């Protein structure tokens, strides 16, 4: 009787210790005897002791990968520093686990290569004014390339585009000159309107005096 009770307690402990609760927006990749068995979605699951193991816990939420600045060369041979932000989701936990050794390293390398290829076909001015187009091209290329890894790229953003200091200085001077030009135009238009209003006021006053 005591032996039976001990066995029951051990079985109960074994079951409890092998209960797994998968939270919302998560997935568990399960291996049985070293080989892929199944993928658990949200809910309560029981793992077979000694036979099954959780190979990987995967988040299904959108994730953000903020990569450090990468040196890139434009079509007109200007070297710039550009850092990218990639927003992605894991859509297939099995492929994500077994498709590639280090997914994040692979995404970073792929992002850098794709960015260099796109920027290499554009001149500096195009790079500075075509950010949305570059973002869109990168997203399409990265999404297609990462699909075999169980990853969907939702969007890509170029966070900073930093040309060489001498070009930055020239751009700042050009922007300052453009601001001053616009201010001068606005000032001249304001003075013109004021002069017109003053002339119209004097004209009306003269008419009133003549009528009197």
Question: Can you say where each PLM-predicted feature lies in the sequence?
Answer:
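Single-pass alpha-helical transmembrane signal-anchor segments
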Residues: 1-19
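Amphipathic, interface-forming alpha-helical segments with heptad-repeat character
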Residues: 22, 30-41, 45-178
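Hydrophobic alpha-helical segments and their boundary regions
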Residues: 6-7, 23, 32, 66, ...
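Long, charge-rich amphipathic alpha-helical coiled-coil "stalk/tentacle" segments
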Residues: 166-212
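Short helix-to-loop capping/linker segments positioned immediately adjacent to catalytic or ligand/cofactor-binding
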Residues: 16-18, 125-131, 141-146, 184-186, ...
